[in-house]
Amino acid sequence: MAITPTINSVHGRLRSVTDTDPGAQAEISETVPARRRWSIKSIFFHLVTDGTVANRHVSLIIDDGANDLWKITCSSAHPASCDTTYSFAQIAATEALVNCACFHPLPTLSLPAGARIRTATSLLKAGGE
């Protein structure tokens, strides 16, 4: 009999979730599957923008499927023609921008089934990924 972790189980495992590239003008959205609970340790993604002049601001949003539970908007603007790595982790103390990498603190999160992790980017233009 196979035992897999569920929200009623004391078992758990470290798992990396890799989504497909959402493509131009699309945002990231991951949903916790049914009968699962995710304990989030870190979130890591890239945003590549084209030459369209605009300062974009990236937000990371955690919701319960309908209502926002946690949201952070990066204070550092993401300019045109730029490839920036965004990293949210429990080890970061404050927001920092270092060599096209943006680091942000992440609270301890335990998400039930149906909860979502998603991004929202202001002024996302054609060619931005």
Please report, for each region that a protein language model flagged, where it lies by residue.
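Beta-strand-centric surfaces of beta-sandwich/beta-rich domains
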Residues: 2-129
